[in-house]
């Protein structure tokens, strides 16, 4: 798998299971633009770099209260990396 699109969750375990299991080349997290504390996200990146040194981790702020905004963000990522290369993981998201 090339690109995993994931909804960032406050629960760290929900953020790492799919990438560590599926081992994508790139993981793109859509996170709440109102999130102030980025320490957990930095720790997540460190975890991936230790376990999958070649992975690319991206984070995109979105208004998580708007389904329309979330859908538009997912579509932009899918267009950027070609939809056939993308997998959307929906079990997380706070």
Task: List each language-model region with its residue ranges.
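Active-site histidine-anchored catalytic micro-motif
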Residues: 90-94
């Amino acid at each position: 798998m090339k690109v995993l699109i994931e909804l960032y969750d406050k629960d760290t375990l929900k953020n790492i299971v799919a990438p560590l299991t599926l081992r994508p080349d790139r993981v793109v997290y859509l996170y709440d633009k109102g999130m102030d504390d980025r320490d957990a996200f930095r720790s997540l990146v460190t975890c991936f770099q230790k376990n999958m040194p070649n992975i690319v981790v991206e984070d995109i702020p979105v208004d998580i209260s708007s389904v329309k905004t979330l859908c538009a963000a997912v579509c932009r990522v899918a267009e950027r990396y070609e939809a056939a290369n993308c997998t959307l993981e929906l079990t997380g998201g706070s």
